[in-house]
Curated annotation (Swiss-Prot):
<keyword id="KW-0173">Coenzyme A biosynthesis</keyword>
<keyword id="KW-0963">Cytoplasm</keyword>
<dbReference type="GO" id="GO:0004594">
    <property type="term" value="F:pantothenate kinase activity"/>
</dbReference>
<keyword id="KW-0067">ATP-binding</keyword>
<protein>
    <recommendedName>
        <fullName>Pantothenate kinase</fullName>
        <ecNumber>2.7.1.33</ecNumber>
    </recommendedName>
</protein>
<dbReference type="Pfam" id="PF00485">
    <property type="entry name" value="PRK"/>
</dbReference>
<dbReference type="InterPro" id="IPR006083">
    <property type="entry name" value="PRK/URK"/>
</dbReference>
<keyword id="KW-0418">Kinase</keyword>
<dbReference type="InterPro" id="IPR027417">
    <property type="entry name" value="P-loop_NTPase"/>
</dbReference>
<comment type="similarity">
    <text>Belongs to the prokaryotic pantothenate kinase family.</text>
</comment>
<keyword id="KW-0547">Nucleotide-binding</keyword>
<comment type="pathway">
    <text>Cofactor biosynthesis; coenzyme A biosynthesis; CoA from (R)-pantothenate: step 1/5.</text>
</comment>
<keyword id="KW-0808">Transferase</keyword>
<dbReference type="InterPro" id="IPR004566">
    <property type="entry name" value="PanK"/>
</dbReference>
<dbReference type="GO" id="GO:0005737">
    <property type="term" value="C:cytoplasm"/>
</dbReference>
<dbReference type="GO" id="GO:0005524">
    <property type="term" value="F:ATP binding"/>
</dbReference>
<dbReference type="GO" id="GO:0015937">
    <property type="term" value="P:coenzyme A biosynthetic process"/>
</dbReference>
Length: 308
């Protein structure tokens, strides 16, 4: 692994090198279970789980164990027991890159460690400002950009979880309604591990940010041309499935031809998602603990892991 001695904060491993680091981590997923976790257009299969995600699961296991030893050292120093501090993992990347699938697969793999940790998953979609508020602020065209989130609410949520607060509530988002679901929340009650998945979770700022509270982070990466293709493909699939629901926010696209829908999807990508990727998401890649680099087939080709 020559990359370990290169002048870079990252170790770069190709897939062949990375898969050997799985060691004895057992395969704990079935094809039926993976089907339930797979996102629209994502090509992840059991081989991908074995060669990419099981080594990652092993790495996180080792990091969590080190985290616990560090907490024990703090208790020894203070001479008193400390409340359990959840290990928080951020998962970041562009729209359509497959970060949601990555987060869901990781959640299941981590839950099935021999130590049986409680692993919760929260997406930052629930912390988007309600549609009515976005319209009031004239930000609907900026949905997904940092300013479209209730950053204070998100930071408060993560801070409470990190400090060991019981039964912390997180808002819930509906992709069908394209809005928060009023009066509906999920409860996060002192998990061993919390996975936070979202577009902008690695953002930095002049004051405390969500990313400052992460113990580990994963950035799902790919060429922007590939992500554009995946976004358009996903849009076409949704046109023929979820958009057909009369209650769906994008129902008006359901009767578009594939050619018409492709034009719409490409315009949305080029005017909203690509600028957000280039201005806000991609610049945070350097802050990730680990980068999963995908090829055109949606499968991971190489991994970059921070040395420090």
């Amino acid at each position: 692994m020559d990359a370990m001695t290169s002048p870079s904060p990252y170790i770069e491993l190709d897939r062949t090198q990375w898969r050997t680091l799985r060691k004895s981590m057992p395969q704990v997923l079935t094809e039926d279970e993976l089907e339930q976790l797979r996102g629209i257009g994502d090509e992840i299969d059991l081989e991908e789980v074995s060669e990419v995600y099981l080594p990652l699961s092993r790495l996180i296991f080792l990091r969590v164990e080190a985290h616990r030893r560090l907490n024990a050292a703090t208790e020894t120093f203070l001479g008193e027991a400390m409340p359990q501090i959840p290990y928080i993992i951020g998962v970041c990347g562009s729209v359509a890159v497959g970060k949601s699938t990555t987060a869901r697969v990781l959640q299941v793999l981590l839950q099935r460690w021999e130590t049986n940790p409680r692993v919760d998953l929260v997406t930052t979609d629930g912390f988007l400002l309600p549609t009515a508020e976005l319209e009031r602020r004239k930000l609907m065209h900026r949905k997904g950009f940092p300013e479209s989130y209730d950053q204070a609410e998100l930071l408060s949520f993560i801070t409470k979880v990190k400090s060991g607060t019981q039964k912390v509530q997180a808002p819930v988002y509906s992709h069908e309604a394209y809005d928060r679901i009023p009066d509906q929340t999920i409860t996060v009650d002192r998990p061993d591990i919390l996975i936070v998945e979202g577009l902008n979770v690695l953002q930095t700022g002049p004051t405390l940010m969500v990313s400052d509270l992460f113990d580990f982070s994963v950035y799902v990466d790919a060429r922007r041309e590939d992500i554009e293709d995946w976004y358009i493909d996903r849009f076409l699939r949704l046109k023929n499935t979820a958009f057909k629901d009369p209650e769906a926010h994008f129902h008006h696209f359901a009767n578009f031809s594939d050619e018409e829908a492709t034009v719409v999807a490409r315009e949305i990508w080029q005017t909203v998602n690509l600028p957000n990727l280039m201005e806000n998401i991609l610049p945070t890649r350097v802050r990730a603990s680990l980068v999963l680099r995908k090829g055109p087939d949606h499968l991971v080709q190489k991994v970059r892991m921070r040395k420090i």
